[in-house]
Swiss-Prot record:
GO BP: arginine biosynthetic process via ornithine; L-arginine biosynthetic process
HAMAP family named in the record: ArgB (MF_00082)
CDD domains: AAK_NAGK-like
InterPro entries hit by this protein: AceGlu_kinase-like_sf, AcgluKinase_fam, ArgB, Asp/Glu/Uridylate_kinase
Species lineage: Bacteria, Bacillati, Bacillota, Bacilli, Bacillales
Subcellular location: Cytoplasm
UniProt feature coiled coil, ranges: none
Keyword field contains Amino-acid biosynthesis: yes
Organism of provenance: Bacillus licheniformis (strain ATCC 14580 / DSM 13 / JCM 2505 / CCUG 7422 / NBRC 12200 / NCIMB 9375 / NCTC 10341 / NRRL NRS-1264 / Gibson 46)
Keyword terms: Amino-acid biosynthesis, Arginine biosynthesis, ATP-binding, Cytoplasm, Kinase, Nucleotide-binding, Transferase
Listed name of the protein: Acetylglutamate kinase
Gene3D superfamilies: Acetylglutamate kinase-like
Amino acid sequence: MGKTIVFKCGGSVIRELSDEFFQNLKDLTESGWKIALVHGGGPDITKMLKKLNIRTEFVNGQRKTTKAVLEVAEMVLSGSINKFFVAELTKHGLPAVGVSGKDGGLLLADYLNEKEYGQVGRIKKVNGQMAEALMEKGFIPVIAPLSMTDGCETLNVNADLAASAVAAALRADKLMFVTDVKGIMKNEEMLKELTPEDIESLIAEGVISGGMIPKVHSAKEALTDEVEEVMIVSGKGSFLTKDDFIGTKIIKQKEAVS
């Protein structure tokens, strides 16, 4: 399939993506990269739940998804935020198709723990053919993190884990976690390359803190036999130069220097 890159954009960054970000995507497609996007939508879901007076709670950092919460999550993820993202891509000259993990049986899942988390899934299989077909025709699939069980029940899935699973199924060359910072910083300098061991040391030192901790843990867990390189990049500026990507690269291990 040529070179493939998967981007994961969190719900908090989608509405703040810069023109440079979209131009970078265009540059990548023009140089032969095939692109898939997976997005979240947490802040928009929270706003809509408040608007509709639907109570929600978090268990171990994960939103408990009752049937009422799932209806809202699907409305936001497959509806408003997905179509907003598609429109932004189209506006910047990037042909995009909005889908959810339910379409084409893209994401198949089992219940994570119905008693504790409700309608939340653990991805067990990715059917990448639909996404591959769209990319082969020059479209960017924009994927909302919803899934179906074997019995066709809808389950919400963590967007980071969905992006990781999609990247593995597509055998992507790179998986990019798009954030509001250009990478992981230490003493005002961006760290270019980290291993999982480096990440744990930097967390212990307090260099990586707050909202960046779950991001780096997701990036670290995304490293698999199929996905050997994950990057944390900015959606608020350029993440691409003529020669390379700008961001912090997370790899399994550094090559030995002979």
